Amino acid sequence: MWRESPERQQPLRTGLTTGTCATACALAAARLLLTGKSCDECEVTLPKGRKVRLPIAECRRLDVYSAYAATVKDAGDDPDVTHGAQVFVIASLGTGAGEVRFSAADGVGTVTRDGLSLAVGEPAINPTPRRMIREHLLELADECAYNGAFDVAVGVENGAALAQKTMNPRLGIVGGLSILGTTGIVRPFSCSAYIASIHQGVDVARANGYDHIAACTGNASEDYARRHYDLPDMALIEMGDFAGALLKYLRRSPLRRLTIVGGFGKISKLACGHLDLHSKASEIDLDFIADAAGSLGATPNTLAAMRAANTSIEALRLAGDLPLGDLICRRAWEKAAYTMHNSMQLEVVAIDRQGLPVGAYAGEDL
């Protein structure tokens, strides 16, 4: 694991991205080829200028022109799917002055759909890691008076299996993981990778001709959207609890139509104005739900029972035939429309635990 950073006094420990790991491995392997010197530690410079040292688990020649180096990914205290995975690089010397060419080794995926920051057919090594690797290798080449090219194949042990726990299959990245990172540092529980995958999902849908997407809070809502709207998986966005991340992105980069589908409790949180729907960030407000029922004519006894309910669904059922679900969806629609602040067609649907609709609102103009 990488030597503890100055942040070690904080409760949560930062980690390093797969892009930083790949950079260290590429540099270690290339240095072995150009100088004959192996290493058990490698220093790299992050995009903002900070230097970090990574342990190199293995560094060896494969032949005269190629070498292998590997490190173990340390995500710090972040629950990263790649934490503990071995990232490796096979670096080779080639022809072409100043060129650095990239390919995917085992465990790194390939882009198969438009809309991402990489062209179709490219290995899923994102732009910042590519730039980091290129800059470090060209600096090494200058130090060693090397005028040729580098071919860099990046891989992750067991990456194909790990990728099934990520958004890569939905985004059209097949065969493995993506090599990620914009700062080189993993911030614990920052959720930046998940939010980035939401944005990428929107971009992929747009690039492939889908102008209607359904943002879903979970599996049941996704199943409902798939059945009810006949949308392909590419147009289904796993929003989860990050309503704000999606809505603010669509404010900057709109589509024609958005449908939000979620459990009634999650939709009630959005109706309250919460853009982070996770239980750690926002709570279901039974008073808010009861007040909405009161505006529809619920009796005092019903309102008292709703305020004392164990769950939002129980409160909804206590409202009986009152169109409470529709009203909560309308309030959520208003918050979402205000956040997007554009002319996108918008619909909000709330479902129960069985995946059945309990409320909907699509705006008076739709």
UniProtKB/Swiss-Prot annotation:
InterPro entries: CbiD, CbiD_sf. It is an enzyme of class 2 (transferase). Keywords: Cobalamin biosynthesis, Methyltransferase, S-adenosyl-L-methionine, Transferase. It comes from the Bacteria. Pathway: Cofactor biosynthesis; adenosylcobalamin biosynthesis; cob(II)yrinate a,c-diamide from sirohydrochlorin (anaerobic route): step 6/10. Gene3D superfamilies: CbiD-like. It catalyses: Co-precorrin-5B + S-adenosyl-L-methionine = Co-precorrin-6A + S-adenosyl-L-homocysteine. Its EC number is 2.1.1.195. One of its GO terms (molecular function) is cobalt-precorrin-5B C1-methyltransferase activity. GO terms for biological process: anaerobic cobalamin biosynthetic process; methylation. The keyword Methyltransferase applies. SUPFAM superfamilies: CbiD-like. Belongs to the CbiD family. This is Cobalt-precorrin-5B C(1)-methyltransferase. It comes from Hahella chejuensis (strain KCTC 2396).
